[in-house]
């Protein structure tokens, strides 16, 4: 697709298995996975992000009395240190990607949109 925004999934071997990072076109890591025990499981996690991120609902847990959305969904929340984060849950409720901490809510929301845009057509390295 000409003109499509394309990020990339980078698979890394770590001490206890494999994980992936989703990087935006500028090379910045915008979401990361848990550690999977085997590479095929990690690749399945990537496929799940590619399938779920573009259609996921947005559940803003920062709003008092927020509406609980159906999976798949992005959950935006504040962590214990007061930073804003998001996690992407698959249809089965499993967390398949998480963000770094952001100082501003707007930056966190931009991160969600970046995952939506960059994941669907992303290449895997």
Where are these regions (language model features)?
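A structural feature that tracks compact, well-ordered secondary-structure segments
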Residues: 8-14, 19-36, 45-49, 73-103, ...
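A low-complexity, Ser/Thr/Gly/Pro-enriched, surface-exposed linker/loop concept
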Residues: 39-66, 107-125
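Intrinsic disorder/low-complexity detector
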Residues: 2-15, 51-80, 122-124
């Amino acid at each position: 697709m000409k003109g499509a925004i394309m990020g990339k999934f980078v698979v890394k071997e770590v001490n206890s298995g494999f994980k992936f990072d989703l990087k935006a076109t500028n090379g910045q890591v915008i979401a990361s996975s848990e550690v999977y025990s085997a590479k095929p499981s990690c690749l399945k996690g990537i496929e799940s992000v590619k399938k779920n991120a573009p259609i996921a609902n947005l559940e803003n847990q920062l709003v008092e009395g927020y509406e609980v959305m159906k999976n798949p969904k992005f959950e935006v929340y504040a962590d214990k240190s007061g930073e804003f984060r998001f996690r992407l849950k698959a249809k089965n409720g499993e967390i398949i990607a998480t963000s770094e901490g952001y100082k501003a809510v707007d930056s966190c929301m931009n991160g969600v949109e970046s995952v939506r845009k960059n994941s669907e057509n992303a290449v895997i390295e």
